[in-house]
């Protein structure tokens, strides 16, 4: 309850807080034409798999190449809807697996808060790996999904082949609090006031898909170098039913609350797989968090993208897909 109260207050009204400004001094992976975006017309398959405790998890696969990538979406509480169509270029020559985390999207909704714990999410990732017969898997985690991938790496480093943290949520609880403060400072008083009203409607049981879209649009506009680039989204922020949308924010807060005062910075030294951490200079997530992730994993590469925010494929698609594909191919050769 204390965590929920604190975070609800943080969403609309946290005071301004400035994180360390990232620079372009970190070398990016070299680009080549083979990594450029291509047609989004790729083979698609979807279905359900059984997660921890019998929970049904919705999945979608793109492509049919021998190399396999598992994508972990952000949130918590959101769905793959903002990623599966937008990251389709990764399916060039490989199979890309997306899944909706428990309690969101098309996966089974969860009534018992205890079933939304970190342990359940990690067990679900293990279920995804087992369902697709992967001895080891390449994880690509975005935002909260990057943090979840970090927790998975802590527990199951031997089951990883490669690790990509795309604009990951901070590896510490204090870093997340700083992130919330930066979002509030960027949003301004009028937007913060409306966000506060929406949060009130959510917990009054009046949330629906349209309200979810408004909330996410207001909040995520602070995540971009240029908010106009939000129009480049091919999928949907809240591409879910009203019932799922109504549970998004409570699910989000429950999952974050279950993490306690997390700190992964000293818990990843045993992770030895090729690792790439991506950070955009305009991201609201503090640069220090991406730096800490890269420093915590031996040999990890930190790629800082100029004039790009939290969703680099929407603001700098050609360098993003080129660089990411270059990393994945080179990692295969190591």
Language-model features: locations:
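Conserved acidic catalytic loop of the alpha/beta-hydrolase fold
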Residues: 119-137
């Amino acid at each position: 309850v204390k965590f929920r109260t604190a975070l609800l207050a943080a969403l609309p009204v946290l005071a301004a807080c400035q994180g360390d400004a990232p620079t372009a001094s970190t070398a990016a992976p070299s680009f080549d034409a083979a990594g450029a975006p291509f047609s989004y017309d790729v083979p698609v398959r979807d279905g359900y798999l059984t997660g921890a405790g019998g929970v049904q998890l919705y999945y979608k696969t793109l492509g049919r190449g021998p190399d396999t990538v598992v994508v972990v979406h952000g949130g918590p509480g959101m769905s793959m809807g903002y990623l599966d169509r937008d990251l389709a270029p990764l399916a060039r020559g490989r199979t890309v697996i997306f899944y909706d985390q428990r309690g969101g999207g098309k996966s089974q909704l969860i009534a018992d808060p205890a079933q939304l714990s970190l342990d359940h999410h990690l067990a679900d990732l293990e279920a995804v790996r087992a369902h697709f017969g992967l001895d080891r898997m390449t994880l690509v985690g975005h935002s909260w999904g990057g943090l979840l991938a970090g927790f998975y790496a802590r527990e199951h480093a031997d089951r990883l082949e490669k690790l990509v943290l795309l604009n990951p949520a901070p590896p510490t609880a204090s870093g997340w609090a700083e992130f919330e403060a930066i979002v509030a400072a960027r949003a301004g008083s009028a937007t913060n006031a409306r966000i506060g009203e929406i949060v009130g409607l959510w917990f009054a049981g009046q949330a629906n898909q349209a309200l979810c879209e408004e909330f996410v649009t207001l909040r995520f506009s602070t995540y971009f170098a240029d908010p106009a680039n939000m129009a480049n989204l091919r999928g949907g922020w809240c591409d879910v039913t009203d019932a799922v949308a109504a549970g998004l924010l409570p699910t989000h807060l429950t999952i974050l609350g279950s993490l306690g005062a997390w700190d992964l910075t000293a818990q990843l030294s045993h992770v030895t797989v090729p690792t790439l951490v991506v950070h955009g200079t305009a991201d609201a997530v503090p640069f220090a968090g991406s730096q800490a992730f890269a420093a915590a994993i031996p040999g990890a590469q930190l790629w800082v993208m100029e004039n790009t925010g939290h969703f680099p494929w929407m603001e700098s698609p050609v360098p993003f897909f080129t660089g990411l594909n270059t990393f994945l191919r080179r990692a295969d050769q190591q």
